[in-house]
Amino acid sequence: MQFSKMHGLGNDFVVVDAVTQNVYFPTEVIKRLADRNRGIGFDQLLVVEPPYDPDLDFHYRIFNADGSEVSQCGNGARCFARFVVLKGLTDKKEIAVSTAKGKMMLRVKDDDMVCVNMGEPIWEPNKIPFNANKFEKNYIIRTDIQTLLCGVVSMGNPHCVTQVEDIQHANIEILGPLLESHERFPERVNAGFMQIINRNHIKLRVYERGAGETQACGSGACAAVAVGIMQGVLDNNVQVDLPGGRLMIEWQGKGHPLYMTGEATHIYDGVIRL
């Protein structure tokens, strides 16, 4: 199997062309490939498939290192877009793809930056999914060690965002797993911890479901900014600093799609026997 190793701000991926190759990924194969000591090593496996809809260019599949399939990965989407252009699978710079839960528009820029139309944030609890009677800007979520005030949103995958005073000393190693598997999230959740610098600048760390804390989480950055705007503490254009680097997020509010812009880096190509 031919593959490419890529990363978006340190969030690393193996990207596989399933348009010109016949590939199949059982859970045990994904886990073996994800092993950083005995396999290739990655946060997520991204698979480029032929479009399910003739009006689209590709279908985009995402698997976590534990073998679970998820419906969204913003950093992965940027790498996906660069991959299909680099490999000559398309000559378009505006690429339309489907995911397990919707559609995305990806725009490859000349400076290796990619802008992703992430769609409109989803706030209805039953669509996230999140166990709550109605939408609220802030939810009280109780864990074994702490009661938290959180914003909850879906960017195609569920996110729980908590504001912290100091991102470096936030108790993410403990709170991340507790939120990820909290009973109010039937499909588990990505837990984001946001420090607000000013109305146009935040720092963020994300504990991703199925992957743990990563260097960067694109959909997590989108979720944090959307929550901050909804809560009235952020403006419409926000710089997000993650451990792996910087993303720019723009959202004009309800009724509008959210845009994420950031780097997508190709590291190397390889061949492995499955």
Curated annotation (Swiss-Prot):
Entry protein name: Diaminopimelate epimerase
Which family does the record claim for this protein? Belongs to the diaminopimelate epimerase family.
Places the protein is found? Cytoplasm
Q: Name one Pfam family in it.
A: DAP_epimerase
Pathway field of the UniProt record reads: Amino-acid biosynthesis; L-lysine biosynthesis via DAP pathway; DL-2,6-diaminopimelate from LL-2,6-diaminopimelate: step 1/1
Q: What does the record note on quaternary structure?
A: Homodimer.
PROSITE patterns recorded for this chain? DAP_EPIMERASE (PS01326)
What SUPFAM superfamilies is this protein classified in? Diaminopimelate epimerase-like
Q: Which GO terms describe its biological process?
A: lysine biosynthetic process via diaminopimelate
User: What does this protein do, in the record's words?
Assistant: Catalyzes the stereoinversion of LL-2,6-diaminopimelate (L,L-DAP) to meso-diaminopimelate (meso-DAP), a precursor of L-lysine and an essential component of the bacterial peptidoglycan.
Catalysed reaction(s)? (2S,6S)-2,6-diaminopimelate = meso-2,6-diaminopimelate
First-level EC class: isomerase
Q: Name one GO molecular function term.
A: diaminopimelate epimerase activity
Q: What is its main location?
A: cytoplasm
Tell me which species this is from: Histophilus somni (strain 129Pt) (Haemophilus somnus)
Instruction: Return the annotated site residues (Important for dimerization).
Output: Y268
Name the residues annotated as site: Could be important to modulate the pK values of the two catalytic cysteine residues: H159, E208
Spell out the InterPro entries in the cross-references: DAP_epimerase_AS (IPR018510), DAP_epimerase_DapF (IPR001653)
| UniProt keyword terms in alphabetical order | Amino-acid biosynthesis, Cytoplasm, Isomerase, Lysine biosynthesis
Active-site residues, Swiss-Prot/TrEMBL: C73, C217
Where do the annotations place substrate binding? N11, Q44, N64, G74, N75, N157, N190, E208, R209, G218, S219
User: Entry's NCBIfam families?
Assistant: DapF (TIGR00652)
